[in-house]
Amino acid sequence: MSQHDPVSAAWRAHRAYLVDLAFRMVGDIGVAEDMVQEAFSRLLRAPVGDIDDERGWLIVVTSRLCLDHIKSASTRRERPQDIAAWHDGDASVSSVDPADRVTLDDEVRLALLIMLERLGPAERVVFVLHEIFGLPYQQIATTIGSQASTCRQLAHRARRKINESRIAASVEPAQHRVVTRAFIEACSNGDLDTLLEVLDPGVAGEIDARKGVVVVGADRVGPTILRHWSHPATVLVAQPVCGQPAVLAFVNRALAGVLALSIEAGKITKIHVLVQPSTLDPLRAELGGG
């Protein structure tokens, strides 16, 4: 058990982050979970003491598994469902600055996934790792077994394709990403202290699935959130919806709820949980969540 205990700790520390990363790449919660589980299986088999940066190692393995999956799906011409049907009409062209970067708006639309489908496998992985998760090209090069210069070229091509596709693609502000990920990791680990750090003291939330009932105050909202959404069968991933930071909650790989977050000055000020079937059914059909 001496080797299993550190892996269990790694699972608690990194699983939520890795599932979020994998979901951004493959667009299917079931596949994302499988990729992360396989990465941890390989960590369990890795020689003790050979890994200096545990999260970095897991990012590399998970990303390579996702890349292999995307390549395999492309070969079989199996592409995820077109989720743009659920959220259409907001297409716009991002302007490009002199460095030829996509000028990304203030939020991520669900259309991000369908936009990524227009990229080749390597382009997709590089774009997600660099533009969304902020990893440097040198680290990405290690991940995909290439050179940093090649990764820059892949990113350049990806940004060109995104602009040419005329699909609205935007990345939520960096602060929103940090807060949302901290929220997810706290919930995934049942860590009330960390959750309270990202909640505004006066946070208000409709979070108990009873319409019109609002809970106010971090000391009440935090425990209620954990009671409903911190379970072994629950997987949370960041996926802004309709222009608002949000978290998708999957239970046994089926979409069970959408937690819409209002974030101000680095704190969550409002949480609205959507669990009505009429709201979730269209998303379930499009996100591969059952």
Curated annotation (Swiss-Prot):
Natural source organism: Mycobacterium tuberculosis (strain ATCC 25618 / H37Rv)
Inducers of expression: Constitutively expressed at a low level under all conditions tested. Transcribed under control of SigJ.
Function (record text): Sigma factors are initiation factors that promote the attachment of RNA polymerase to specific initiation sites and are then released. Extracytoplasmic function (ECF) sigma factors are held in an inactive form by a cognate anti-sigma factor until released, although no anti-sigma factor is known for this protein.
DNA-binding region: 137-156
Domain notes: The sigma-70 factor domain-2 mediates sequence-specific interaction with the -10 element in promoter DNA, and plays an important role in melting the double-stranded DNA and the formation of the transcription bubble. The sigma-70 factor domain-2 mediates interaction with the RNA polymerase subunits RpoB and RpoC. The sigma-70 factor domain-4 contains a helix-turn-helix (H-T-H) motif that mediates interaction with the -35 element in promoter DNA. The domain also mediates interaction with the RNA polymerase subunit RpoA.
Motif annotated as Polymerase core binding, chain positions: 34-37
Annotated protein name in UniProt: Probable ECF RNA polymerase sigma factor SigI
Keyword Transcription regulation: yes
